[in-house]
């Protein structure tokens, strides 16, 4: 199989990531931070090492400003529900993922916030906005948004900035602390190359979020209230130590290879864009230059349903995703709300041969032949 669905989750994982999971489960399976014996301490060390590796990748000074969770959706819910106070005005992008849109819709429906959704949220920014929730790159067109510019605007208007880095962490350089980003959420299982069931959230020093959940943390056990210290305040319950071990190794892999990964992604994205644009009746969405996007390209073939095209590609041994990609307002803005689009997304292991195989298959589908 040719795997081109990396915007959903990355595959394959580096060998170092696979070994980290096996080693943790086979030899270091204790509960981190819950006991004083050597195996528990070793498990806690794995979590700390992963936190430090991710802090290095994000250029964050204090690793304790990074908290772990179940996935990016979990982290976005913590950020939004923890930061939004009664009466706040929240602005987000029409290209945001449902992991942002649905929590905000719930908060707005409950009367807790006022919500504005804009195709160009930076043009809508003003002193009435209390929180801006912005994707670093959207998961449909792959277009990269100007987060640094957004941070400047947010500082100007004394507005909180939440960045959804689901499609960029591990591929693009991230400097949330330096840029002035207040909150930055990411999954561990996409370009960070870790296991599914992992996510992380950077929380700016001094910003106090209301915890999303309460429970055991292994510290301050005499208290019936959540501890104030980070990261324990936001990490109730037993952590996914094997998953966090994989995330740590994935972050280290990205520390070593990120510029190379991005460079190859640019070349392959240019190849994919040029090839698709050369096929009659193929419509490509988003920026037509690779520099302005990550390695995610959505397209349609004539009037064919996106699901049919994806099924034919699957029959040809090529994994892509069709439909609305959990971003219905993005498709509405693109004019593809009825049929969605076919999305091919590159990863660190993608090759020119993979791209060429996809292009040949799409060309066959366009000609009406069996793929």
Go through each PLM region and give its residues.
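Pyridoxal 5′-phosphate
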Residues: 1-371
């Amino acid at each position: 199989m040719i795997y081109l669905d990396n915007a959903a989750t990355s595959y394959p994982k580096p060998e170092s990531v696979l070994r980290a999971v096996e080693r943790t489960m086979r030899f270091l399976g204790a509960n981190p931070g819950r006991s004083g014996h050597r195996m528990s301490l070793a498990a806690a060390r794995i979590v700390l090492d992963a936190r430090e590796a991710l802090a290095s990748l994000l250029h964050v000074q204090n690793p304790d400003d990074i908290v772990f969770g179940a996935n990016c959706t979990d982290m976005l819910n913590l950020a939004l529900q923890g930061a939004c106070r009664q009466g706040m005005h929240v602005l987000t992008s029409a290209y945001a993922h449902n992991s942002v849109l649905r929590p905000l819709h719930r908060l707005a429906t409950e009367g807790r916030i006022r919500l504005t959704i804009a195709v160009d949220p930076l043009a809508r920014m003003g002193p009435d906005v209390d929180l801006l929730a912005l994707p670093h790159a959207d998961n449909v067109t792959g277009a990269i948004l100007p987060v640094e510019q957004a941070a400047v605007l947010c500082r100007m208007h004394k507005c909180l900035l939440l960045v959804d880095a689901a499609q960029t962490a591990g591929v693009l350089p991230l400097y949330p602390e330096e840029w002035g980003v207040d909150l930055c959420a990411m999954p561990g299982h996409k370009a960070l190359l870790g296991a599914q069931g992992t996510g992380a959230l950077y929380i700016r020093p001094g910003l106090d979020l209301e915890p999303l959940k309460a429970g055991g943390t292994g510290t301050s056990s005499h208290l019936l209230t959540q501890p104030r210290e980070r990261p324990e305040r936001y990490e109730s319950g037993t952590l996914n130590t094997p998953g966090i071990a994989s995330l740590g190794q994935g972050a280290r892999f990205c520390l070593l290879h990120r510029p190379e990964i991005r460079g190859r992604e640019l070349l392959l994205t240019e190849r994919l864009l040029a090839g698709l644009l050369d096929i009659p009746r193929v419509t490509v969405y988003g920026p037509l230059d690779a520099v302005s996007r990550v390695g995610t390209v959505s397209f349609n073939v004539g009037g064919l349903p996106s699901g049919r095209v994806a099924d034919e590609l699957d029959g040809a041994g090529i994994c892509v995703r069709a439909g609305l990609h959990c971003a219905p307002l993005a498709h509405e803005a693109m004019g593809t709300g009825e049929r969605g689009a076919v999305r091919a997304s590159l990863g660190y292991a993608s090759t020119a041969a993979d791209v060429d195989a996809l292009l040949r298959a799409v060309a066959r589908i366009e000609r009406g032949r069996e793929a």
